[in-house]
């Protein structure tokens, strides 16, 4: 009977710890000019970008457990979104960023092992880089630079001359 009580207590403790393992929710919005510039850095996880017709950037998603800091800094012309991981390589969970940006905003995304998915951007410049994450892009930028060292690339579907 005592063994059963100990097992039940341990099981309940494990279940109670599950929410602590989940990441921290992200929900931030900043103004950005229609033709502003956004830079996004995320080491691991996923970065999804969708264009919309508002002059603001909205970031939602989940900050991975163990991440040091999430920052969204800048002004109406330039905005930088960065996920900072601890300098020591400890156990950190992936971060998922879902970013809505003005359709004409220039966009630069750099990741290491995070997938990148961009849809609907019609900017002057689009730059997407990932070391080992996959990249999918669909839009109409004037210039596009897409680099994946060991990840797959599904490139721009329509280019403006």
Q: What are the residue ranges of the model-derived segments?
A:
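Acidic (Asp/Glu) and glycine-rich low-complexity loops/linkers
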Residues: 21-130, 136-148, 154-161
């Amino acid at each position: 009977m005592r063994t059963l009580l100990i097992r039940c207590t341990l099981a309940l403790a494990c279940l109670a710890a599950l929410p602590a393992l989940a990441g921290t929710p992200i929900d931030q919005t900043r103004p950005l000019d229609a033709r502003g510039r956004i830079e996004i850095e995320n080491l691991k996880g996923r970065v999804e970008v969708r264009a919309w017709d508002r002059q603001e950037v909205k970031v939602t998603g989940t900050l991975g457990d163990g991440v040091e800091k999430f920052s969204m800094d800048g002004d109406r012309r330039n905005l930088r979104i960065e996920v900072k991981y601890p300098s020591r390589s400890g156990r950190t969970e992936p971060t998922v960023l879902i970013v809505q940006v003005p359709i004409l905003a220039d966009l630069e995304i750099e990741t290491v092992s995070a997938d990148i998915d961009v849809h609907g951007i019609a900017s002057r410049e689009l730059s997407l880089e990932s070391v080992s994450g996959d990249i999918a892009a669909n839009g109409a930028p004037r210039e596009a630079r897409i680099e994946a060292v060991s990840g797959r690339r599904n490139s721009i579907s329509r280019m403006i001359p």
